[in-house]
Structure formats: structure tokens, C-alpha cells
From Swiss-Prot:
Positions annotated to bind Mg(2+) 2: 31, 146
Organism: Bacteroides fragilis (strain ATCC 25285 / DSM 2151 / CCUG 4856 / JCM 11019 / LMG 10263 / NCTC 9343 / Onslow / VPI 2553 / EN-2)
Region of interest (DHBP synthase), residue spans: 1-204
Binding sites annotated in the UniProt record for Zn(2+): 260, 271, 273
Protein name: Riboflavin biosynthesis protein RibBA
Cofactor: Mg(2+); Mn(2+); Zn(2+)
Gene behind this protein: ribBA
UniProt GO molecular function: 3,4-dihydroxy-2-butanone-4-phosphate synthase activity; GTP binding; GTP cyclohydrolase II activity; magnesium ion binding; manganese ion binding; zinc ion binding
Parts forming coiled coils: none
Binding site for Mg(2+) 1: 31
Site (Essential for DHBP synthase activity): residue numbering on this chain: 129, 167
Main function: Catalyzes the conversion of D-ribulose 5-phosphate to formate and 3,4-dihydroxy-2-butanone 4-phosphate.
Residues holding GTP: 255-259, 276, 298-300, 320, 355, 360
Length: 404
């Protein structure tokens, strides 16, 4: 059986710019689906009909966060608990020139209106028949989803940053997977690409971090080298702690650790962060080679003030997930794209990832890094963090083993 070959990102961009559909597939560990995607400004009633006839999924229109704000499009819910946190806003219809909003003509008009800078909030009726999606800033380098891939393709093609997408479903009602998606692309003469390749293309074309000078860093856990990095988008500073050298294709121990001031510095018993960090350093020292990327992403990305507010909610009975949601955040707000580029910058291609968190594995693999092994880094619970760890196991899918 011949290996499946996808198109290059350059080929897809050229077709997208001409107003053609592109099929975009994501990681098999994520949604494992493919979508028809087209630039919003290129949509027509005929193309909407094609999407609904041959895609059969939910017709959506990804737009930027800024465009959502301009059009005063609120999110459908304040706390998004869907599996992949699909960022639906309120649904809309264009008011002028449309009737019920459901016809192919009306849906095309509404999608094009979302990509028209002249469209104002009052021009859109709510609810409607089009589902706008709010793409995260920095696109697939922030979130490896079809929503962000759509807006990225529009930007790379020099078009207005808005698109239309729909999931591709087989005639029997099952989700189309890669072999079927390749056949769909062949049947309709379309380009097909992966989000992973789009991420790799952007990482190759763009630099999102600045690298500082390298210094020796002797610690109580071993002798390391330290390199600071500054994130270009917001000035946040991160650290790579490096031990030894390795061959290009050699898998090494890697820990991507989000900063935890309370645990890492003060030894808080409310979490296991400090103990995990120190155990990772000990394991890398024993192995003679490896990397810890220390990310400035306090409280799973919500910041110290909000993390302490979440602690207060936990004292009132909320678990760690519901506390974040109550404060208006996702359960995990971390940005794995920055950590991935730091790893690539220091020459890591393959890794034995030290984590109990399956989302971290998916997040890093989406950025073109190969994880050859998952190395658990479990810490014995104490009376102060047992409920917290149980929530991470039960609600966030962490691989943890301890008695109730």
C-alpha cells in the first residue's frame, strides 16, 4: 500500500487564494477529522450547497477575535465545557437582502458579510443560521484546530481573515478519516493538507521567540545549562534548562513545566508542581541528557492573581476545573506552541515526554515534535492535594494511580 501523500502548504495557499476549497485534516489523537475550508470572501450560494451536500457537517465561519469584538459577537456560553472547546459565538443572519436566512443564497450572503469591513453589529440578526467561530490570536501556533487553520490560510493567501468550513462526513453518517478524505480530494480535484504541516510551515517562516545568552547553571539536582527566551507577542520570558548533548534523531527526556510560584518556590502542598520539577531534574541528571522547558504560564496560563482566586473558590467547594470556568477561563489556557518552538530552537526533534497529561502530548505533537515515549512523573498525594489530583485524573484525563 502506497503511503498517503498530502499537498504542500504552498500549493494549498495558491488554491485557497483562487477561491477553491482546501481539505484540512487534524491529528488522529485530536478530532481526527477533515473539513472543507474556503475563504469567506470567495463563498457563493453554489459553494455553500457543495459544502452542505458533500460535507454534511455543521457550516461555520471562523473569524478573528478582533472581528468578533467589532461585530459584538458574544460566545454562546460563558464556560465552554465541550471536548475541544470549539469557540462558537452566537449565531447570526445578515438582515438586509436575506429572507429566512436558511437558503444557500442567504447563508452565502451572511458569510460574506462577516468578511466585509463595512458590516456593523446592527446589520446582523441574532440568532441566525451561520455559526461564527472565534479563532485564537496567533492561529495554529496558539491552538491546533480547524478554526485557526482556516483564518491562517486566509492570512497567508493575502485575503480577509475569515473563512467558511464544514466537517466531512461519509454517506453512511460516519466521520471521514484520512483515507476517505484523500479519496474526496481526488474526486473533486482539491488540495489536502494537515494542520501539523501548517504549523511546521509557520514555525519555519516565522520566529515567535528571541533567544538569550547561554550560561552554566549548577543546582542541587545537577549541573545544567540555562538559556532564556522572550516571547515576541507579549514579552513573557521562559527558560530552557539543558543537560548534555544528543544526536539529531535521538529521543531525550523532556519536561515542559508551567511555572508555579506557590509550588516551585514556596513548596505548596496544594499541588505537586514543585516535586514534579525537582523529580524531573533528578531524572534528567541521572540520564545524562535532557531538557526542561520552564514556561511562564502560572496557573495553567491564567496568571498568579487568578490562580489564587481559583484557590479561594476551591476552599469554597469548587474543584480546580470548575474554579477556572467560574472565573471565565478554560480549564487549561496554556500555549504549547511557544514551548514547541523553544524545543526546536535548541535542537530537540524526538523526545521521551515527562508528563501525566495527555493534552500536553497532543499539544506538542501538533507542532511537529515526535514523542517516542510517555514517561510518567507521578508524585505521592498528600491530604492537601488529593482532591486536586483526583480532579485532574477524573476530569482532565491525567494518568494517575492512587487509592481513594
Amino acid at each position: 500500500m502506497e503511503p498517503i501523500r498530502l499537498n504542500t502548504i504552498e500549493e494549498a495557499i495558491a488554491d485557497f487564494k483562487e477561491g477553491n476549497f482546501v481539505i484540512v485534516v487534524d491529528d488522529e489523537d485530536r478530532e481526527n477529522e477533515g473539513d472543507f475550508i474556503i475563504a469567506a470572501e470567495k463563498i457563493t450560494p453554489e459553494k455553500v450547497n457543495f459544502m452542505l451536500t458533500h460535507g454534511r457537517g455543521v457550516l461555520c465561519a471562523p473569524i478573528t477575535e478582533e472581528r468578533c469584538a467589532e461585530l459584538e459577537l458574544d460566545m454562546q456560553v460563558s464556560s465552554n465545557t465541550s471536548i475541544y472547546e470549539t469557540p462558537f459565538t452566537v449565531t447570526v443572519d445578515l438582515l438586509e437582502g436575506c429572507t429566512t436566512g436558511v437558503s444557500m443564497h442567504d447563508r452565502a450572503m451572511t458569510i460574506r458579510a462577516l468578511a466585509d469591513p463595512k458590516t456593523k453589529p446592527a446589520d446582523l440578526g441574532r440568532p441566525g443560521h451561520i455559526n461564527p467561530l472565534r479563532a485564537r490570536s496567533r492561529g495554529v501556533l496558539r491552538r491546533a484546530g480547524h478554526t485557526e487553520a482556516s483564518v491562517d490560510l486566509a492570512k497567508l493567501a493575502g485575503l480577509y481573515p475569515a473563512a467558511a468550513l464544514i466537517e466531512i462526513i461519509n454517506e453512511d453518517g460516519t466521520m471521514a478519516r484520512l483515507p476517505q478524505l484523500v479519496e474526496v480530494a481526488r474526486r473533486f480535484g482539491l488540495k489536502i493538507i494537515s494542520i501539523k504541516d501548517l504549523i511546521a510551515y509557520r514555525l519555519q517562516m516565522e520566529s515567535i521567540v528571541d533567544r538569550g545568552v547561554e550560561v552554566d547553571m549548577p543546582t542541587q539536582f545537577g549541573h545544567f545549562r540555562l538559556i532564556p527566551f522572550r516571547q515576541k507577542s507579549n514579552g513573557m520570558e521562559h527558560i530552557a534548562l539543558i543537560k548534555g548533548t544528543w544526536d539529531t534523531d535521538e529521543p531525550i527526556l523532556v519536561r515542559v513545566h508551567s511555572s508555579c510560584m506557590t509550588g516551585d518556590i514556596f513548596g505548596s502542598c496544594r499541588c505537586e508542581c514543585g516535586e514534579q520539577l525537582h523529580k524531573a531534574m533528578e531524572m534528567i541528571e541521572a540520564a545524562g541528557k535532557g531538557v526542561i522547558v520552564y514556561m511562564n504560564q502560572e496557573g495553567r496560563g491564567i496568571g498568579l492573581m487568578n490562580k489564587i482566586a481559583a484557590y479561594k473558590l476551591q476552599e469554597e467547594g469548587y474543584d480546580t476545573v470548575d474554579a477556572n470556568l467560574h472565573l471565565g477561563f478554560d480549564a487549561d489556557e496554556r500555549d504549547y506552541g511557544v514551548g514547541a518552538q523553544i524545543l526546536r530552537e535548541i535542537g530537540v526533534k524526538k523526545m521521551k515526554l515527562m508528563t501525566n497529561n495527555p493534552v500536553k502530548r497532543i499539544g506538542l505533537e501538533a507542532y511537529g515534535l515526535e514523542i517516542t515515549e510517555n514517561v510518567g512523573i507521578e508524585i505521592k498525594p498528600n491530604p492537601y492535594n488529593e482532591r486536586y489530583l483526583k480532579t485532574k485524573k477524573d476530569r482532565m484525563g491525567h494518568t494517575l494511580h492512587f487509592n481513594k
